[in-house]
């Protein structure tokens, strides 16, 4: 007996079965997948950062 895992589409909230029958998972459709990609590209979404990265401008891979 196998249980289906159901997740909500991050874009529209529709139920999506997590499995081979849902090729765009966790999204319900290609449309929702592209909407999400567009939001990341437009910087409407971002991963929060706890630190101040202002000192990273002087960073270099070269050894002193």
Swiss-Prot record:
Write down the required cofactor(s). Answer: Zn(2+)
**Positions with a binding annotation for Zn(2+):** 9, 12, 28, 32
- Its transmembrane ranges are none
Q: Where is the signal peptide?
A: none
Statement: the UniProt record of this protein carries the keyword Zinc: yes
Q: Which ranges are annotated Acidic residues under compositional bias?
A: 54-64
Q: Annotated region Disordered: where?
A: 45-64
Which biological process, per GO, is one annotated for this protein? Answer: regulation of DNA-templated transcription
Q: Which InterPro entries match?
A: DNA_gyrase_inhibitor_YacG (IPR005584), Znf_NHR/GATA (IPR013088)
A GO term for molecular function: DNA topoisomerase type II (double strand cut, ATP-hydrolyzing) inhibitor activity
What Pfam families does this protein map onto?
YacG
How the cofactor is bound: the record states: Binds 1 zinc ion.
Q: Which domain of life is it from?
A: Bacteria
The UniProt keyword set, sorted, is:
Metal-binding, Zinc
Into which family does the record put it? Belongs to the DNA gyrase inhibitor YacG family.
What's its job? Inhibits all the catalytic activities of DNA gyrase by preventing its interaction with DNA. Acts by binding directly to the C-terminal domain of GyrB, which probably disrupts DNA binding by the gyrase.
Q: What interactions and quaternary structure are annotated?
A: Interacts with GyrB.
Its protein name is: DNA gyrase inhibitor YacG
């Amino acid at each position: 007996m196998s249980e289906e895992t159901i997740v909500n589409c991050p874009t529209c909230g529709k139920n999506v079965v997590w499995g081979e029958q849902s090729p765009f998972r966790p999204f319900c459709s290609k449309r929702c997948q592209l909407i999400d990609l567009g939001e990341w590209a437009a910087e409407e979404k971002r991963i929060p950062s706890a630190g101040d990265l202002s000192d990273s401008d002087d960073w270099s891979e070269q050894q002193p």
